[in-house]
Amino acid sequence: MSTENTLSVADLARENVRNLVPYQSARRLGGNGDVWLNANEFPTAVEFQLTQQTLNRYPECQPKAVIENYAQYAGVKPEQVLVSRGADEGIELMIRAFCEPGKDAILYCPPTYGMYSVSAETIGVERRTVPALENWQLDLQGISDNLDGTKVVFVCSPNNPTGQLINPQDLRTLLELTRGKAIVVADEAYIEFCPQATLTGWLVEYPHLVILRTLSKAFALAGLRCGFTLANEEVINLLLKVIAPYPLSTPVADIAAQALSPQGINAMRDRVAQTVQERQYLVNALQQTACVEHVFDSETNYILARFTASSNVFKSLWDQGIILRDQNKQPSLSGCLRITVGTRQENQRVIDALRAEPV
């Protein structure tokens, strides 16, 4: 048998996958901490009891109770809701449904969430970046100049990792610019912390608007992996063609439906109030800490701050078991670390450790 043309397993893989740098999630980056403030999770667990025991049967593709509860919560029709394995799957579904590999492009505005880029690269779709302006708002002219061949524009509001809302007038301008040309995906993963800013009321006006949501943040269910896509029925029907036949396991659907009950939503709002209170405490303390140069405004459950020696600070806290998120490699975020709002005890540990840093 000839071995001249034998390929290794790696050689058999697609070239773009061989070259792909995977998304560096908080868990993938690791660490041996006991204060985890790097993934924007809620700091304490919420307990649920499973009520569905029919694990011998396949689940519904789109569990009725989950869809109806979320539609009622979000103020949309059930036909405008799709549930998936986290909002990350929603990102991937949008690219798979709307972009031809090798022909179409997605566009996003760094510094922002990393999965838009990774999902496009995995699928083999061109990635276009239009860096945000100095105040991290949209460069509308830059976006307009790059719309030819762009099928999906991703905008994160509030933006991760910077924490600010995108100017609503700019979002309207973007939706007018893209009408009949591209889909605009508004990632509202953190919208529960500023619900007045949601774009759900705009879905009637803009058939090309899509909104991503999650249970990972304010609902305190990051381990559940449950997200939502809100859009007009025409878009949802296209996504239903490409989603897996059983995206949610029965236990996930069971817990999600409970979390979206009236009691579950009230509990979520209590958590938001608690988080906002702790965020203010953390902001005030950071502003009075010598190694902190600047604390940026936040509408979320995390704070971005610029430090005098951020790499040293990051490593020092890491060595003490306090795990933050280093943002130095993101465009325009030199010297910045992102800190999830934790419990009062966790927040105090961060402040105490930072105040012990040499300046």
From Swiss-Prot:
It is an enzyme of class 2 (transferase). Its EC number is 2.6.1.9. Belongs to the class-II pyridoxal-phosphate-dependent aminotransferase family. Histidinol-phosphate aminotransferase subfamily. One of its GO terms (biological process) is L-histidine biosynthetic process. Pathway: Amino-acid biosynthesis; L-histidine biosynthesis; L-histidine from 5-phospho-alpha-D-ribose 1-diphosphate: step 7/9. GO terms for molecular function: histidinol-phosphate transaminase activity; pyridoxal phosphate binding. Pfam families: Aminotran_1_2. Homodimer. The keyword Lipoprotein does not apply. The modification N6-(pyridoxal phosphate)lysine is found at residue 217. This is Histidinol-phosphate aminotransferase. Its cofactor is pyridoxal 5'-phosphate.
